[in-house]
Curated annotation (Swiss-Prot):
Zn(2+) 1 binds at residues 68, 73, 90, 93. This is Squamosa promoter-binding-like protein 4. It comes from the Eukaryota. One of its GO terms (molecular function) is DNA binding.
């Protein structure tokens, strides 16, 4: 009788890799309801957290009603504003200058919406010092209306207003820089000439009567067709105004 080796043991059949979710459904619920709930949870992962947070706030943090956290109060915050309910403080104690919270003296800050130590407040202020400083800094307006006099040639709007009347903005120079009229332009007719009905004065005579500006007369007057009478009228009024200010300074 011939010898034969024993047959090799066969490995058990491996289970299928795919899981049938329909077979593992919760008893009493269909597979469609389970798949719909799973899809909704995957699409909105933060909805369940918000629902839990809302239930915790309604129940006072996991049990009981929301009450004021000030020691000796314990008022149930029902039918009050959401602001006081959220920060767990009744309306009366939110305005108290001194309360006791967790065994320490505190004051409720209206800006921070939480309790601070009394040393962080100024006198009986209901907002802490840091928040008041930030609030006042925002209310300060920067001074942007400062005029700059650095331009060499001033615009014509400084010399004439909207009605084309002569302005007195050039009377801002110190009195020591303004020279009075040395000789009246109407005393000597030799320096005055007329052509086509316009009056022309000697330029050297004009330079003696003008204030000591660093700018030439052609740069001061933007309009070249001004008559000499208009120029003398302007500087005559300017001289009178300067004399009035000189008299006022002596009183």
């Amino acid at each position: 009788m011939d010898w034969m080796p024993p047959p090799k043991p066969t490995s058990p059949r491996s289970p299928p890799l795919l899981w049938d979710w329909a077979d593992a459904a919760v008893p009493g619920s269909s597979s469609g309801e389970v798949s719909a709930a799973a899809a909704a949870a995957a699409a909105h992962p933060g909805r369940r957290r918000k629902e839990k947070r809302g239930r915790a706030e309604e129940g006072g943090g996991g049990g009981g009603e929301v009450r004021c956290q000030v020691e000796g109060c314990g008022v149930e915050l029902v039918g009050v504003k959401d602001y006081h309910r959220k920060h767990r403080v009744c309306e009366a104690h939110s305005k108290f200058p001194r309360v006791v919270v967790a065994g320490q003296e505190r004051r409720f800050c209206q800006q921070c919406s939480r309790f601070h130590a009394l040393s962080e407040f100024d006198q009986k202020k209901r907002s802490c010092r840091r928040r008041l400083y930030d609030h006042n800094a925002r209310r300060r307006k920067p001074q942007t209306d400062v005029f700059s006099y650095a331009s060499a040639r001033p615009p014509s709007s400084l010399l004439f207003d909207d009605n084309r009347q002569i302005s007195f903005v050039w009377n801002k120079a110190p009195l020591s820089h303004v020279r009075p009229f040395a000789i009246s332009p109407w005393e000597s007719s030799s320096e005055v000439g007329t052509t086509d009905g316009h009056i022309y004065l000697d330029k050297s005579h004009i330079s003696k009567s003008l204030p000591a500006f660093n700018t030439d007369i052609d740069e001061l007057l933007p309009m070249k067709d001004f008559s000499a009478a208009t120029i003398w009228m302007f500087f005559g009024v300017l001289f009178i105004r300067t004399a009035q200010e000189s008299c006022m300074s002596f009183h």
